[in-house]
Amino acid sequence: MNFKSKKLQALAAGVMLTLALGLAGCGGGEKKAEAPKAAAKVNVGIVQLVEHAALDAANKGFVEGMKSKGYEEGKNVTYDRQNAQADQSNLQNIAQRFVNNKVNLIYAIATPAAQTVANATSDIPIVGSAITDYKTAKLVKDNAKPGTNVTGTTDMNPVAAQLDLLLKIVPNAKTVGTIYTSSEVNSQLQIDILKEAAKKKNIVIKEATVSNVNDIQQAARSLIGKVDALYVPTDNIVASAMPTLTIVTEEAKLPIICGEENMAKAGGLATLGVDYYKLGVVSGEMAADILQGKAKPQDMAIRGQKDFKALINMKVANKIGVKIPEEVLKGAEVVK
């Protein structure tokens, strides 16, 4: 095993261990915390990188998480909601807006959003979501104990297990394609883990990178006829362009295994799904604890999802002529 392999395994294991330790409650079985009797009125800035189902769900979940802790919009919390439309200059303007307005806390949805606001302020608490690895993104010193003004939830998905799912559905697959945004560090991390897992199974990975949504179809077409299936990570550009991607893949009858459930529902075939709404709820609860003075971001471990349930899009399976094995369907959520 080379140094890079060891480093990747340690990194993935470290993130997943943080999830196991930091999120005993993302599954929803825990007791609800009592809402504070009188929460002081606060202003919260919400910056979302781009509009797509997963990030929208994380946004909605955050508001619910805050509400569960006593913060109700229009009563004791005001949200300044901003969408950067995947534009870096927009992100910088939004970050400066929040700093100038002296918001009490910033909720940053997706890595570029969190990185931009973290560069703009080291004083205002920042809670993130839809971020795969905070340490790799240089947002924290350590995922278990951030040591900065940033904390939140991670959307790290079980990449190696996603490959296992792909091979159960397409058992004869020898070459797997992947499409991701070259500038997204979280996507690159997932692809590195995918390549390590594939090497152990003698699976060849063919990559196609994009820089914006306009590159998606060309990237997909470059893989047609060269791969047996696709794996797409939790990548914001790809997620926002799933309908565009599936125009190509459905025509070629190419199955897509996705990094999260909203992408699978939007035209992918299957996933071991990340639930962004629940992650948003947990982020909201963490934010409320910070605002109430119960915790500080520098001491709050990054939290994430522990259990991943298979989701199968039978509508897509029927369209592309893929038979889903009974062992995969058993216990899975089925979209018809």
Predicted regions and their residues:
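Hydrophobic alpha-helical segments within soluble ligand-binding/sensing domains
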Residues: 134-173, 275-295
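C-terminal motif of bacterial Sec signal peptides marking the signal peptidase cleavage site
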Residues: 22-25
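Extracytoplasmic "Venus flytrap"
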Residues: 41-69, 80-89, 183-187, 237-240, ...
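An alpha-beta-alpha
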Residues: 44, 62, 151-198, 300-316
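Bacterial N-terminal signal peptides that target proteins for export
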Residues: 2-13
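Hinge/cleft segment of the Venus flytrap/periplasmic-binding protein
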Residues: 13, 289-336
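Beta-alpha junction/loop-to-helix N-cap segments that form part of ligand/metal-binding clefts
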Residues: 84-141, 232-259
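Bacterial signal peptide processing site
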Residues: 27-30
